[in-house]
C-alpha cells in the first residue's frame, strides 16, 4: 500500500483547518481496506474510494503550527476529498503570504501533527500554553510555575504573579526543588534533585486534559518538618492516583529559613505582612488551581487538600487561616503532629541568631545583607543548633493563632475531614529529639500512672515509644476530630499494615508509611526497600479507592468495603487499616482521653 494512502486513513483526526482546492488525483481504493485493518477499523473504507477525488490543499498561518497544533478542528467531510489521500502539486507560497501544501505533503504533515499531538498534550493556562507528556492513561505537566521566582528582592516576600509567556512552555521535566540540607532530604524522603531558590512550581496529573471534564481535584502538600522535601519526588508521582479519575496536583513551597523567617530588618520593610512564606506559597498554589485547573479537566469547586506530616500540619493551618479557608472543599490530614508552633517573638530571636551564624551583625543586619546570603548557606544551618521550622510562626496574618486553638473556637473551614496516623510514628519523633522522659515530665505523671494504660508493654523503651506515638500523633488526631465533628463530618483512621516483605522486621508502620499506598507508588519508588507483593498492591488499591471516593463525594465509603462510620466525641470510632479494614470503637479510649486531658501538651 502506498504510504500516502496509509496517511490518508489517519487524516480525519488531524487538528488543522482545511480548505478545499480541486486537482486530479489517482485512485487509492485498492489499498484502503489494508489501511483499515492496520488501524483496527472495521468499516469498508474501499467504498469511499470508488471515484477519483480532487486535491485537498491546506491553507493556514505558519505561526499557528509553531504554537503547537492547536488550530481549530476542521470537519473534513465538508469538502471534496477530505477523507482521502490526494496527491497534487508541490507546496508553494500563496500570494497572501500563507503556505499552500499539496495533498501528499499535507497528509504527511497531518499524520506527524496527529502523532505529536497525542504525545504532547497542550493546555492553555492563564499565563500561557504548556506542553506536557502523555502516558497511557494520564497527561502529565511538570514544573509549572505558580508564582514568580522568590529571589533577590522577592526573598522573604509574599509570592508574586508569574510573568506570562508567549510560546509553548515545556512541562515534561520536574522543576527544581527548594533549597534544603540535602542530608536531611536523603534520610527523610528521597533525593529532591536540583536545588534552586527559583522553586515555586507544581505538577499536574490528569486523566482528561480538557476543559469541562469537572473531575475532582486533589492537591498534595509534602512532608519534611517544613525544612526538607519536594512535591516532585517519585513517591508523590500522581499518575497512578490520577488514573482513578481525579486530577492530582503536587507542589513545592519554601522551606526552612527561606520559608519561615522573622528578622527585624525584614519586618521593618513590610510591617504586618505574613512571615510564614511557605504557607503563603501553598495559598498561591491553591489560587493557581482555582484559576487554571478547569483547563486540565479539574473542577475548581471540588478541591481536596491533603498532606502528610508537615504537609498535614499545613492542611490544618490553611483550614484555619483567614486567607485560605475558602480555597478547599475537603481535607485529608495524614500524621499531623501535636508539637507547639513558635510565637513570633521566639521566631524573631531565631532570625537574629541566623544572621549572626552567617557572619552578619545579628539584629543590626540589613535586609539587603540578609538577601545577599546564598540560599545554600542558609539551608546548611538546619540541623545545627538552630531549630528553624519544625512549627509555624504564630502571630501573622496567615497563622494568627495556633490551628488547634482556631479549631477550638470553631474558626476552621466547615468541610469534610479525613484524619489519622500510623502505628509506629515514633520512628520520626525520636529522630527530631522528642524524648519519652521529657514528655512524661511535661504530662506531670510518672511511669506508675502510665503502666495501666499500656498493660501489654513490658519494656521501658517500648513504653516510651508508644507513649510518644500516642501523645504526639494518635491523641492529636483524635483531638482535632472531636473539635471538628461539631462543625462538619470527620472520618478517622489508624494505619497498621506493614508491607509483606517487612513483616517481623518492624514494630509497626513508620511515619510516612501510608503515603505510597495512598498514591499507589510502591512500584515506582524504593520507598519501602522491598518489592510489593500482590497483597500489598491489593491493600493499597483499597486505600486509594477510599481517598478518591472522599475527594469525589466528600465521604470515604465504597460498596464492597466495610462501612467507615464518621467519628464523634461520643462514638470514638475509626477504621483500622491492617491486613483487612476493621472498624474500631473506643479505640485507645483511656490513653487518648488521658493525654488530651493533659491540656497544654498539644498546644502552645
What do the PLM-derived regions correspond to, one by one?
Residues 12, 28, 35, 41-45, ...:
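Hydrophobic helix segments
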Residues 103-114:
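Bacterial N-terminal signal peptides
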Residues 117-276, 300, 526-543, 552-563, ...:
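Non-catalytic accessory segments of hydrolases
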Residues 188, 284-287, 291, 317, ...:
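Substrate-access "cap/lid" subdomains that shape
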Residues 272-294:
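Alpha/beta-hydrolase active-site loop
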Residues 297-308:
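Alpha/beta-hydrolase fold nucleophile elbow
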Residues 308-317:
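Glycine-rich nucleophile elbow surrounding the catalytic serine of serine-hydrolase chemistry
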Residues 316, 394-604:
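C-terminal subdomain of alpha/beta-hydrolase-fold enzymes, centered on the catalytic histidine
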Amino acid at each position: 500500500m502506498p504510504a500516502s494512502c496509509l496517511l490518508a486513513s489517519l487524516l480525519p483526526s488531524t487538528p488543522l483547518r482545511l480548505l478545499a482546492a480541486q486537482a486530479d488525483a489517482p485512485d487509492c481504493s485498492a489499498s484502503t481496506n489494508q489501511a483499515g485493518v492496520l488501524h483496527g477499523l472495521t468499516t469498508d473504507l474501499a467504498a469511499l474510494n470508488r471515484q477519483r477525488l480532487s486535491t485537498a490543499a491546506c491553507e493556514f498561518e505558519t505561526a499557528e503550527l509553531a504554537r503547537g497544533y492547536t488550530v481549530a478542528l476542521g470537519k473534513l467531510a465538508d469538502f471534496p476529498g477530505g477523507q482521502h489521500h490526494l496527491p497534487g502539486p508541490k507546496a508553494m507560497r500563496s500570494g497572501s503570504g500563507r503556505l499552500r501544501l499539496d495533498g501528499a505533503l499535507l497528509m504527511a504533515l497531518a499524520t506527524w501533527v496527529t502523532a505529536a499531538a497525542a504525545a504532547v498534550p497542550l493546555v492553555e493556562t492563564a499565563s500561557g500554553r504548556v506542553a506536557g507528556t502523555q502516558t497511557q492513561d494520564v497527561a502529565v505537566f511538570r514544573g509549572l510555575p505558580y508564582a514568580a521566582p522568590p529571589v533577590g528582592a522577592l526573598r522573604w516576600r509574599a509570592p508574586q504573579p508569574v510573568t506570562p509567556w508567549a510560546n509553548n512552555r515545556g512541562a515534561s521535566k520536574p522543576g527544581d526543588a527548594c533549597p534544603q540540607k540535602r542530608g536531611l532530604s536523603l534520610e527523610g524522603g528521597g533525593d529532591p534533585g536540583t536545588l534552586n531558590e527559583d522553586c515555586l512550581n507544581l505538577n499536574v496529573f490528569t486523566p482528561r486534559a480538557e476543559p469541562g471534564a469537572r473531575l475532582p481535584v486533589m492537591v498534595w502538600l509534602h512532608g519534611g518538618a517544613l525544612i526538607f522535601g519536594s512535591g516532585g519526588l517519585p513517591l508523590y508521582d500522581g499518575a497512578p492516583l490520577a488514573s482513578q479519575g481525579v486530577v492530582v496536583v503536587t507542589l513545592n513551597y519554601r522551606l526552612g529559613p527561606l520559608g519561615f523567617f522573622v528578622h527585624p530588618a525584614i519586618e521593618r520593610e513590610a510591617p504586618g505582612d505574613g512571615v510564614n512564606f511557605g504557607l503563603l506559597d501553598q495559598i498561591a498554589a491553591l489560587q493557581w488551581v482555582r484559576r487554571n485547573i478547569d483547563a486540565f479537566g479539574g473542577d475548581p469547586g471540588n478541591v481536596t487538600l491533603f498532606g502528610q506530616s508537615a504537609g498535614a500540619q499545613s492542611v490544618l493551618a490553611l483550614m484555619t487561616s483567614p486567607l485560605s479557608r475558602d480555597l478547599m472543599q475537603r481535607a485529608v490530614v495524614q500524621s499531623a503532629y501535636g508539637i507547639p508552633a513558635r510565637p513570633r517573638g521566639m521566631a524573631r530571636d531565631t532570625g537574629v541568631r541566623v544572621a549572626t551564624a552567617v557572619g552578619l551583625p545579628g539584629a543590626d543586619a540589613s535586609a539587603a545583607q540578609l538577601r545577599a546570603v546564598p540560599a545554600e548557606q542558609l539551608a546548611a544551618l538546619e540541623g545545627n543548633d538552630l531549630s528553624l521550622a519544625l512549627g509555624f510562626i504564630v502571630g501573622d496574618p496567615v497563622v494568627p493563632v495556633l490551628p488547634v486553638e482556631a479549631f477550638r473556637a470553631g474558626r476552621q473551614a466547615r468541610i469534610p475531614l479525613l484524619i489519622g496516623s500510623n502505628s509506629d510514628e515514633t520512628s520520626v519523633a525520636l529522630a527530631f529529639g522528642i524524648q519519652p522522659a521529657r514528655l512524661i515530665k511535661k504530662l506531670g505523671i510518672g511511669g506508675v500512672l502510665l503502666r495501666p494504660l499500656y498493660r501489654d508493654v513490658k519494656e521501658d523503651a517500648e513504653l516510651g515509644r508508644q507513649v510518644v506515638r500516642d501523645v504526639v500523633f494518635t491523641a492529636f488526631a483524635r483531638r482535632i476530630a472531636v473539635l471538628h465533628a461539631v462543625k462538619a463530618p470527620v472520618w478517622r483512621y489508624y494505619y497498621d499494615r506493614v508491607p509483606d516483605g517487612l513483616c517481623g522486621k518492624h514494630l509497626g508502620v513508620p511515619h510516612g508509611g501510608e503515603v505510597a499506598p495512598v498514591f499507589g507508588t510502591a512500584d515506582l519508588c524504593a520507598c519501602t526497600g522491598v518489592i510489593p507483593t500482590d497483597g500489598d498492591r491489593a491493600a493499597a488499591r483499597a486505600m486509594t479507592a477510599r481517598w478518591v471516593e472522599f475527594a469525589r463525594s466528600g465521604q470515604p465509603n465504597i460498596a464492597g468495603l466495610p462501612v467507615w462510620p464518621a467519628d464523634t466525641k461520643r462514638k470514638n470510632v475509626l477504621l483500622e487499616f491492617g491486613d483487612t479494614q476493621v472498624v474500631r470503637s473506643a479505640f485507645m479510649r483511656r490513653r487518648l482521653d488521658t493525654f488530651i486531658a493533659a491540656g497544654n501538651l498539644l498546644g502552645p
